[in-house]
């Protein structure tokens, strides 16, 4: 994109920037302020205080980045932001900077930012009398024929003084003599030319040579002077002066002409003969620059280059050439040499302001201010600036070849953190020359990215009975920012369930996101829980994100089967009555057991471990029902003791035993026959009856209370279903010898017992129903129930 050529419509968002740029241009276009200083003033000397002219207070100078800029790479001035003083950066030599030009003015600008303003000013360098008049030739030779009549004027070599104004050359004097006096003539360009005027005729025989001292004086205070010896040789008569073919020669020569190139050939002729007709050529009134640049052949009049030309330094030369014959007569001509400019200078770029580091997300922000220049002329000095097209920057022309580099669209460090910008300045010469200036802009980070977790949710598995401080898993989040904006800190967020004691369950390492269990977990108390973790960066303001963590507690076989019926609490043993007329398969009783574990650890199997008479009774492995294995006979003992083993399917398996007492009776309507070891007293029979009734009533009441409590707990849990996790239970058919007691044990069936008890005066018969325990429906492969602290040892199974 090229600045200075066709411009696209300015977007609305840049109106503010353009306003300040135009404001700066408007101010820059005002009449410049003038300041002056004498040349050769010491570096650091005070020039002027700019506060009043700038219309600023001292405190605003640093804020607005006030600085002095000027064309070229050399900075002659410096600006003190603390005081507003304009100071010299170095000694200034007026003759070196401006030569004979008067006045000697150095333009400069004061650049202000925020908003951008240019303050135009000029520094005039006053001349001091630091140069004396100097004659380039310390001896001036004049050959004057003795026939010259009085009143004849002779032009002599003038002195040169680099100072200007009153300090320049003002007067000449000649030493006292009888033959000549000095006449001063002003030329058209204001130069004083000394001339010798003959007062009386010369006589070579009387005085063949006259020596005079010519003194040049300047107008300084005190004046300076320079002298030269004027040696006059009186020669014989020569009545024809050399005449040039042209009084003015105009030539053009390219500035890249090689040394030794011919510039021009001048030619003069003399009508005299002999030595009076022999012509020699020499420079007349030639400055030091002319003598350094050109060489003149005394015999041929050929003007040659002595050194390379430079259009940017000197564009024209006026060379005075004098032709002198052997008799001392001379004539002059002028060779006007015009140096032709070539495109031999590439453009120059001077950076005034450069901001190397820019925060991201900024737009229409000033990056750099620079100026361009080309010492060539015409199209060779016209320039255009450009940068790469694929960058979010654009160039804005300002005033007097000043440009600003501005951000066009907001930068994003995460997309690109560094830009290498090449500013190309190209002139319109042939061939086109260009200069490239590279700058690097670093995009600094702004906290515009929140940490992002690698997963939106994490599922962690922990086996119960773990050791405290166990590492159970990790969460991880990354931040696309850099530095402190990318440093992530992890934390636990308050749980949604106010009853979940999260602070006592888990902790998180704030630096790396490692999660630790603070206590030993109990599956039977808490199967699963979930919580949220936060990740926050250290930016300002800090950004954060969160993720869900689900912790599933895996069951361990840490609970042995618990026999609910018959009670094994050490009280009076439970006695089951079986009629001797019972058929094989007759249901004697049912051993009811539960296991606090889940899944395979809660699958229970039953087997008959001991029996008074093996083969008479059997236990169904899958439901714990005790049934008769064959017909009973009179030979079978009336009292039997059975030991039933209840075993789970864990690894290693855990077990419990239940002891049953079975009493064989002939019929429920007949009197009760005491066991052999029982006392025949009627009081003992009555006591046994009371024990049986109390035991059965207690078991029934216990089951009823358990069912009611379980239903209440389930209803309470459903009200908190939003925070309930999921847990898997074994699927597929159970093994044939196992029964699933998850939530129900073996109490899923209702059954009856008929009991015949002998009273004191007759036979009483009654029946009662066992309480029905409802089936607990499995919650699915992913459902996990929350722990209820008040129901830890109750019928809570998954």
Curated annotation (Swiss-Prot):
Cross-referenced InterPro entries: Cadherin-like_dom (IPR002126), Cadherin-like_sf (IPR015919), Cadherin_C (IPR032455), Cadherin_CS (IPR020894), Cadherin_N (IPR013164), Protocadherin/Cadherin-CA (IPR050174)
Cytoplasmic membrane side: 714-798
On this chain, the residues bearing N6-acetyllysine are 299
Segments on the Extracellular side according to the record's topology features: 31-692
* Glycosylation-annotated residues: 171, 420, 438, 569
Any stretches that span the bilayer, and where are they? 693-713
- Asked whether the UniProt record includes Acetylation among its keywords, one would answer yes
Bilayer topology reads: Single-pass type I membrane protein
Q: Which GO terms describe its molecular function?
A: calcium ion binding
**One cellular-component annotation, GO:** plasma membrane
Q: What is its main location?
A: membrane
| Signal peptide (UniProt feature, chain positions) | 1-30
- Cadherin domain boundaries: 37-135, 136-244, 249-349, 354-453, 458-563, 570-673
The Gene Ontology biological process terms listed for this entry are: cell adhesion; homophilic cell adhesion via plasma membrane adhesion molecules; nervous system development
Report the subcellular localization.
Answer: Cell membrane
Record keywords, A-Z: Acetylation, Calcium, Cell adhesion, Cell membrane, Glycoprotein, Membrane, Repeat, Signal, Transmembrane, Transmembrane helix
- Relate the protein's function as given in its record: Potential calcium-dependent cell-adhesion protein. May be involved in the establishment and maintenance of specific neuronal connections in the brain.
* UniProt xrefs under PANTHER family: CADHERIN-87A, PROTOCADHERIN BETA-2
Q: What is this protein called?
A: Protocadherin beta-2
């Amino acid at each position: 994109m090229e600045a200075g050529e066709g411009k696209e419509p300015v977007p609305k968002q840049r109106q503010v920037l353009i306003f300040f740029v135009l404001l700066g241009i408007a101010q820059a276009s005002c009449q410049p302020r003038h300041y002056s200083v004498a040349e050769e003033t010491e570096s650091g000397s005070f020039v002027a205080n700019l506060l009043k002219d700038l219309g600023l207070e001292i405190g605003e100078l640093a804020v607005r980045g006030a600085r002095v800029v000027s064309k070229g790479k050399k900075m002659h001035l410096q600006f003190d932001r603390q005081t507003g003083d304009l100071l010299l950066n170095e000694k200034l030599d007026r003759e070196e900077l401006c030569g004979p030009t008067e006045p000697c003015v150095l333009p400069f600008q004061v650049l202000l930012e925020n908003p951008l303003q240019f303050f135009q000013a000029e520094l005039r360098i006053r001349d001091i009398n630091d140069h004396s008049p100097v004659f380039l030739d310390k001896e001036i030779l004049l050959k004057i024929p003795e026939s010259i009549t009085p009143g004849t004027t002779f032009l002599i070599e003038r002195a040169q003084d680099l100072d200007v104004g009153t300090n320049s050359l003002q007067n000449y004097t000649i030493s006292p003599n009888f033959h000549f006096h000095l006449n001063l003539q002003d030329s058209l360009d204001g130069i004083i030319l000394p001339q010798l005027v003959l007062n009386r005729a010369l006589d070579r025989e009387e005085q063949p040579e006259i020596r005079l001292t010519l003194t040049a004086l300047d107008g300084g205070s005190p004046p300076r002077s320079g002298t030269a010896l004027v040696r006059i040789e009186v020669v014989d008569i020569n009545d024809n002066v050399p005449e040039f073919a042209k009084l003015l020669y105009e030539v053009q020569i390219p500035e890249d002409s090689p040394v030794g190139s011919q510039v021009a050939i001048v030619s003069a002729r003399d009508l005299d003969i002999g030595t009076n007709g022999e012509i020699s050529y020499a420079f007349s009134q030639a400055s030091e620059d002319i003598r350094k640049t050109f060489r003149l052949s005394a015999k041929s009049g050929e003007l040659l280059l002595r050194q390379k030309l430079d259009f940017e330094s000197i564009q024209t030369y006026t060379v005075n050439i004098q032709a002198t014959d052997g008799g001392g007569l001379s004539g002059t001509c002028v060779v006007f040499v015009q140096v032709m400019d070539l495109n031999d200078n590439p453009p120059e770029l001077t950076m005034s302001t450069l901001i190397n580091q820019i925060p991201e997300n900024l737009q229409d922000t000033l990056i750099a201010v620079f100026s361009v220049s080309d010492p060539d002329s015409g199209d060779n000095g016209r320039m255009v600036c450009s940068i790469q097209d694929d960058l979010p920057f654009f160039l804005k022309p300002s005033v007097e070849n000043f440009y600003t580099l501005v951000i066009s669209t907001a930068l994003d460090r995460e997309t690109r953190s560094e830009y290498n910008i090449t500013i190309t300045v190209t002139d319109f010469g042939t061939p086109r020359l260009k200069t490239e200036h590279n700058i690097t802009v670093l995009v600094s980070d702004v906290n515009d990215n929140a940490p992002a977790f690698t997963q939106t949710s994490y599922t962690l598995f922990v086996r119960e009975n773990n050791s405290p401080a166990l590492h159970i898993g990790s969460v991880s989040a990354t931040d696309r920012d850099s530095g402190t904006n990318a440093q992530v800190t992890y934390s636990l967020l308050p749980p949604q369930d106010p009853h979940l004691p999260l602070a006592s369950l888990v902790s998180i390492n704030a630096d790396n996101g490692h999660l630790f269990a603070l206590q030993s977990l109990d599956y039977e108390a808490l199967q699963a829980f979930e919580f949220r973790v936060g990740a926050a960066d250290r930016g300002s303001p800090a950004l954060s994100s969160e993720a869900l963590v689900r912790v599933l507690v895996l069951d361990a076989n840490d609970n042995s089967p618990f026999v609910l019926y018959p009670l094994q609490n050490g009280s009076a043993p439970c006695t089951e009555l079986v009629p001797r007329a019972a058929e094989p398969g007759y249901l004697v009783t049912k051993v009811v057991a539960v296991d606090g574990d889940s899944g395979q650890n809660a699958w229970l199997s039953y087997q008959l471990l001991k029996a008074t008479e093996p083969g008479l009774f059997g236990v169904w492995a899958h439901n714990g029902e005790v049934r008769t294995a064959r017909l009973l006979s009179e030979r079978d003992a009336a009292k039997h003791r059975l030991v039933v083993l209840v075993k789970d399917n864990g690894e290693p398996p855990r077990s419990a035993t239940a002891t049953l007492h079975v009493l064989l009776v002939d019929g429920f309507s007949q009197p009760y026959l005491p066991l052999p070891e029982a006392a025949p007293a009627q009081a003992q029979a009555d006591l046994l009856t009371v024990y049986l009734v109390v035991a059965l009533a207690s078991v029934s009441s216990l089951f009823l209370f358990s069912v009611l409590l379980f239903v209440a707990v389930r209803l309470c849990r459903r009200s908190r279903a939003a925070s309930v996790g999921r847990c898997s239970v074994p699927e597929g058919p159970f093994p044939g010898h196992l029964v699933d007691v998850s939530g129900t044990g073996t109490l899923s069936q209702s059954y009856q017992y008929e009991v015949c008890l002998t009273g004191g005066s007759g036979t009483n018969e009654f029946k009662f129903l066992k309480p029905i325990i409802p089936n607990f429906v499995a919650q699915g492969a992913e459902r996990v129930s929350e722990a209820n602290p008040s129901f830890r040892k109750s019928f809570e199974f998954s």
